Amino acid sequence: GQIEATNRQRLFTPLDVEPGLVAVDAELDGDALIVAFSDGHRCRLPVAALIQRLGWVADPEAPPAPIAWEPGAAPFPTVSWTAIAGGLNEPGVAEATVDFLGDFARHGFVIIRDTPTTEGTVAEVANHIGYVAGNNFGWVFDVRNEPKPTDLAYTAIELKPHTDQPYRKVQPGLQLLHCLANEAEGGDSVLVDGLAATEAMRREQPDLHEALATIEVDFRYDMGTDVAIDRRPVVQLDSAGRFRQLRFNTKLDFPVPADGADLDAWYAGRRWLAAWMDDPAHQAAFRLGRGDLMFMDNHRVLHARTAFDPTSGHRHLQGCYIEHDGPDTR
């Protein structure tokens, strides 16, 4: 055969295929299509797999489609860590995991309750779902008020809705933030759906949406010895024009040179998005409790934080990132 039996990978290369190869005959054989090629090769293709590959029916193993949400009309997806922490062969764990990952695919976030409150738990949860991805902030980072912060997250000031690290060529895919302590006054959490925001913009201000989807921007992080720069549009679409990814962080974006009209449209679009996301009607606002963990899609859901008083109590979160491959393949 031309396919390795164990790993299902091809054993031939493009150089093994004759130029001008064509299918010369095809016939149904039960639930398969037998195709004969001009070089004498014959292959057996399951009809169900062909129909699925052509997109005529939905892939039963594909994650649920994303659903744009606003707080007033959407559920607030949560799951208990105890329900999903075990092996998939344990009673109830597979079903709870399917529900958890389905909620995450639809809404772009889930709050995981009842996790252990020890340092490093965030990595344990992350490695249960996928694999921790390290960067210049380490494998696991601490979010607390620091005297010399390497990021505004490590201060007590308000943080507006944003996605993390848009300056990376591969922007971190999924973020986990685990609450170890939240005793200070303030410091409430906010989530905003970037899919809902960009869909609203496309409906109401299509020219501004076009500007943010086509004009590339320099995203930059510069700590002297640690510099990262990437150039991308704020809104990234797929080949069919559907939402794929949002890079929105007004602390770190630097527009590239553009003519007056394009630049005006870009700035107007940036302001429109910022205003939409800053509207409490579009924000899911809540307070993380000790043992709560926010699991969110950094390509879609923006997170924010109200200011807090570090003298009024201790506030300490730990965070890390994983990639989409983890939950997508489960």
Spans of features found by a protein language model:
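Short, structured motif recognition centered on aromatic/hydrophobic residues
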Residues: D31-F37, C43-L50
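Active-site environment of non-heme Fe oxygenases that use a 2-His-1-carboxylate facial triad
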Residues: A62-F109, D114-R330
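Short, surface-exposed beta-strand/loop "edge" segments at domain boundaries and coil↔beta transitions
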Residues: H41-L45, T117-G120
